[in-house]
Amino acid sequence: MSSPDLLAISLLVRWLLGWFLCLRMPALPEFTPMGQPRVSVLIPARNEALTLPQLLAALADQSLQPLEVIVIDDHSSDDTAAIAPAAGVTVLASEPLPQGWCGKTWALQQGANRSQGELLVFLDADTEPSPTFLAHLVANHQQYGG
């Protein structure tokens, strides 16, 4: 037998062996898309008693309800801290500001540390989201990542 014949037989045997092994492999489970991510909405607030109720009402009317809404009260001198529990959301009293931090970013850091969601949404207290805001945000996140 010549060298090209041996090469052809070797390739044929390997090809057949590959198909045999491929057919013996277990099938992959059917793909099922992951569910909706759990969404935590974090709201830093300092003296937002006039605007916070509208935002909390808009969040209660979302077509996709968040796992949790956390208001981080950044040392307000008005009724901000009292408004949020009445709406059924969690309120965190901001801890003293560490050196090198700014108030809003420190408040958001504290909220992020306490949140339980996979997707964190940061909103200012004067935001007025549409009823489909969170649903669109999550859909875009699932489609494009983030």
Across the structure, where does each feature detected by a protein language model lie?
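N-terminal membrane-anchoring/stem segments of glycan-assembly enzymes
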Residues: 1-35
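Cell-envelope/extracellular polymer assembly enzymes that use nucleotide-activated donors
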Residues: 37-40, 68
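Acidic helix N-cap motif at the loop->helix transition within catalytic regions
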Residues: 50-54, 78-86, 132-134
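Short, acidic, metal-binding catalytic loop of nucleotide-sugar glycosyltransferases
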Residues: 57-66
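A conserved acidic beta->alpha catalytic loop
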Residues: 65, 73-82, 96
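Short aromatic/hydrophobic "clamp" motif used to bind/position activated sugar donors
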Residues: 108, 120
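The conserved acidic donor/metal-binding loop of glycosyltransferases
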Residues: 124-128
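Conserved donor NDP-sugar-binding/catalytic core segment of glycosyltransferases
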Residues: 132-146
